[in-house]
């Protein structure tokens, strides 16, 4: 049997980078090649290859800039294999902003390299569909009907997917359950606080989360209201642009950033709250999109980002309501990469969980290591994502936890896929969902 592979074409040749944003010397010159990033890097830990480590990728970025390495298939493969989890930034003693480097390299790839057909089309589908609310809602409704009919469950239980490929089965297992009514129906609403107004906040609802995590968004709004927040859900908000930033599609990311800055900034809000670590991380870094492009929006982006808060960060910083009912369960917590590494928020979720009576909390070994979700990484780099998920679930098994907690929707999907393959029943929840349950238990026992 002859295997036919479609080869991608390098369009810049061996002469360095093409037009557009490039990785800057200011950032990669900080690397002292000490190698402390290696053991922090999930792909290096799995493969043991220097070129799939942060240090190795920085070396390749420099070689392309100097014209010693073409912007071709090999370079793209190693840059694409990066999760952009930024664990290397936590480990780095020199303060290398690796995320900026790899995203700039991907901007060059996006502009100057033609990917193979299937990979290009899959990426294009995500990048074009997710920011389009109308198309996303239509697709969500179709998926909801498909899931509600029982057809999806039959397909998953049958062996039909395995006839195509194991990877297809893995990707289908990641598909989120649509939750009606969609949270998009609440866009534009104002939710009054329980008791006196302490803060006036705007809630960032996300894009996929509006369809697949409506209950999580509802729980977030309830918890904020319980803690004295008047919660406004701006109707004009849109996708945060994280997928586009991480893929180097920076022009589109700037458009999406401007949409959110306009929707939130002039509303007189104290804070902009999100329950998605990936969204919060990129929104806090909106100024980076405009620092060389648009001075007016750079200043507005700085003001916007200064008010962005993860919901766990916000609650831990205020005198949050500790009147929780008891949740008698053993729980563990997985640090989302873009909360723990990109935003350096680790203690806040644990502080909130420690306040719930009856909860037995067990630390997860290597909780800082990526679960393999990483935006759409688990779709476009499924083999590596599956390896990381397998390792993560082994660590979860060691805890004996019946509750797996995290603080990012993408991680929820990945971890739920891991749980679905196990014979042991576990729940996977966002931290704020457990807080909401604990408040509800307290109300029932009054």
Spans of features found by a protein language model:
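Iron-sulfur cluster-binding electron-transfer modules in prokaryotic oxidoreductases
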Residues: 98-446
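Cysteine-centered iron-sulfur cluster-binding motifs in ferredoxin-type domains/subunits
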Residues: 24-44, 72, 76-96, 338, ...
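Generic structural signal for well-ordered, non-membrane alpha-helices
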Residues: 36-39, 59, 77, 144, ...
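N-terminal glycine-rich anion-binding loops that anchor highly charged ligand groups
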Residues: 36-39, 49-54, 230-233
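Non-heme iron-sulfur electron-transfer modules
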Residues: 2-20, 44-77, 95-125, 424-434
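Short, intrinsically disordered, charge-biased short linear motifs at domain edges
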Residues: 16-28, 68-79, 192, 225-228, ...
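Alpha-helix capping and helix-loop boundary segments enriched in small/acidic/polar residues
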Residues: 29, 48-52, 70, 244-251
